[in-house]
Amino acid sequence: MSNRLSVVMIAKNAADLLPDCLGSVSWADEIIVLDSGSTDNTVELARRLGAQVYTHTDWRGYGIQRQRAQDYATGDWVLMIDTDERVTPELRQAILKVLDAPQRGAIYSIARRNYFLGRFMRHSGWYPDRVLRLYERARYRYNDNLVHESLDSLGAEVIPLTGDLLHLTCRDFAGFQQKQLAYAAAWALERHQKGKKTSMAGIFSHTLGAFLKTLLLRGGVLDGKQGWLLAMVNAQYTFTKYTELWALSHGYSEKESS
């Protein structure tokens, strides 16, 4: 007998993304959507498309919210995805094979193909961009990180799956930038609360390093114009998060008290 699969996702104001996302996983045994306080019709649309919808508006970070969503699942295995991701037919077949004969205790990694300004990137550190997304529900949990959360793998064997997970990372550059700013602020606050600091030299060395790593070490130059642009975006993101950390450590930012 095949194991039951719960597809789990967190959502906020994702009505434009849900139809394609949920359509790509309609074959799952159950779909769990945890809404974070949408003001559009995300909740109604998700229910209409067959998902079980719950709400938690007291946002405490991505890791906690993902685990809250997982706690509603009842399947033997969890496939954790985002609303801007789509499961390809090849990936679906790979997942179904795992459910028929899983390797107990293993976690399965999935290759993401990230979309940036009209192009699915093939280099730049954005492909294959493997993420741990398919695992036994009762065995694994998410950590409590505010941002860049991860599954506590407990040293488990990681097995790569065939097939890609399409990720619409940047359809709208302004919206993408807003999200990057939020991630950078959360990253800096988390590091500051752990007593981490940086210097002016650290800010600029990390910024330059991010640009060169994306463009040269990770082959961004092979992604054409988008590769160059992504290298600059990564440098900007790195500059923002280290500058915010510097500001927090010097008392020049009010984020900590807000």
Curated annotation (Swiss-Prot):
The keyword Glycosyltransferase applies. Its EC number is 2.4.-.-. It comes from the Bacteria. Gene3D superfamilies: Spore Coat Polysaccharide Biosynthesis Protein SpsA, Chain A. GO terms for biological process: lipopolysaccharide core region biosynthetic process. One of its GO terms (molecular function) is glycosyltransferase activity. Pfam families: Glycos_transf_2 (PF00535). Transmembrane segments: none annotated. The keyword Metal-binding does not apply. InterPro entries: Glyco_trans_2-like, Nucleotide-diphossugar_trans. It is an enzyme of class 2 (transferase). Belongs to the glycosyltransferase 2 family. WaaE/KdtX subfamily. This is Lipopolysaccharide core biosynthesis glycosyltransferase WaaE. It comes from Klebsiella pneumoniae.
